[in-house]
Amino acid sequence: MIVTVTANPSVDRTIGLPHALARGEVQRAVAVTAQPGGKGINVARVVHGAGLGTVAVLPAGAADPLLTQLAAVGLPHRAVSIDEPVRTNVTLAEPDGTTTKINEPGAELSAGDLARLTDLVAEAAADARWVALCGSLPPGVPADWYAEVTARLHAGGRRVAVDTSGPPLLAIAQARPDLLKPNAFELAELVGGDGARLEAAAAEGDLE
């Protein structure tokens, strides 16, 4: 069993445009899709598709469209109820493949919301081998929350993987998760250096 945690989930809407985006003009969409999003949910979707046990843990109100979408695709999930709606992220897709992304900050979690989410993660992880803490943290959540959750999970004998960036990445590194997944730019945040140079070196097979 792999439990995924998405503290800042989203409904991801993609709007297809008939031509290049023109600022300041009215443009009509040629296609619109919406699906549940957030890094942890995406990981759970892949794990579930591979036929392995998984459950996605997240904050969302009982009537939130995100939970309806998760149920529609048959993805196992457990949610802590919150008052604010889950954020909507919008991608504007042009015919040549160019995309413009607009991401909302997310629903603010109160101290009570966060405490209940932390408890639910620990409860869901009772039968798990791995817990994946994924994505950004929403407003109201301290940068060291992933580190706090990791310590609690380690105390229960669970293995923890983390995929995040910015201040939460810097904080979690000190908690020594079992797996940390930075890209080149995030690795540069941790160890210093130039992310673009690290990425170019990796692309060329130069790992020194």
Predicted regions and their residues:
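General beta-strand structural signal in soluble alpha/beta enzymes
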Residues: V5, R78-A79, A132-L133, V160-T164, ...
